[in-house]
Structures are given as C-alpha cells and as structure tokens.
C-alpha cells in the first residue's frame, strides 16, 4: 500500500509542473504523505499548494484547511490557528473552521493563564447563528 502512495506522489509531482494542476497536485501529495505518516512532508506539500494564488477559492480553502488540520496533528497550534483565521476571513461557514478557531483561541487563552470566556461566548454565538441558518431556532 505504501508503494502505491509513493508512486502516486511521483505522478502528482509531474502533474504539479502544470500551473493548472499545481494546487490540486500538491494537495494530493500532502494527503499521500499524511497517509504514509510523514506529517512534516505533508505540511510542506500543503504549504506549496497554498502558494497557488490563482486557484479557485474553494479548492484553496480546502487545502488550507488540510494544512491547518495537519499542523494541529503536529501540535503546531499557533500556526494552525493562523490558517483557520485566513479561512474564516474568506468564508465564515467553511466546514468546522469557526469551531476549530474558537477551540484553538480558547486553548491559547488558557495557556496564557486567562479565562477563556471570550472564546466560549464566540462559540455560543456561532452555535446560535448556525441554528438560525438551519431554521432550528
């Protein structure tokens, strides 16, 4: 199975040479590295993908989200938080970014020795907004 991922990485690296496939190819390379347990290499691939500023917004947000999740996996919470903030500025409803953002901000607040009431209020407000959007008020 790992041989399949390694072969796929080589194919995606070739595809990444074409600017039209840069973001998607490096996104897939990152996923292959994650599947192989090579998390730092996955982060590097996702970062390369995020450098494609001409990519469609949804694809760009998806890869940035994967970068954030992978950084969280490595314990790089401040960097993950930065990625989620970039996503949130563009699309406040993208996946569970708001929840992750609130959670990581709360973690940072607690690590600084301050109560996390601001993050808790944000989380509660966001929960209420989601309920309103779903029509479950």
PLM regions: where:
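Intrinsically disordered, low-complexity, charge-biased linker/tail regions
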Residues: 1-21, 28-31, 35-65, 72-137
């Amino acid at each position: 199975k790992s041989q399949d991922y390694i072969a796929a990485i080589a194919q995606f690296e070739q595809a990444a040479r074409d600017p039209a496939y840069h973001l998607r190819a490096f996104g897939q390379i990152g996923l292959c590295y994650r599947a192989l347990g090579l998390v730092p290499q996955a982060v590097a691939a996702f970062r390369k993908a995020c450098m494609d500023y001409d990519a469609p917004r949804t694809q760009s947000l998806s890869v940035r989200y994967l970068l954030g999740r992978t950084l969280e996996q490595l314990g790089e919470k401040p960097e993950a938080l930065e990625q989620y903030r970039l996503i949130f500025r563009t699309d406040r409803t993208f996946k569970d970014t708001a929840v992750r953002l609130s959670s990581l901000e709360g973690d940072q607040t607690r690590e600084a020795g301050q109560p996390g009431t601001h993050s808790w209020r944000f989380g509660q407000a966001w929960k209420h907004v989601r309920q309103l959007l779903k029509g479950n008020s």
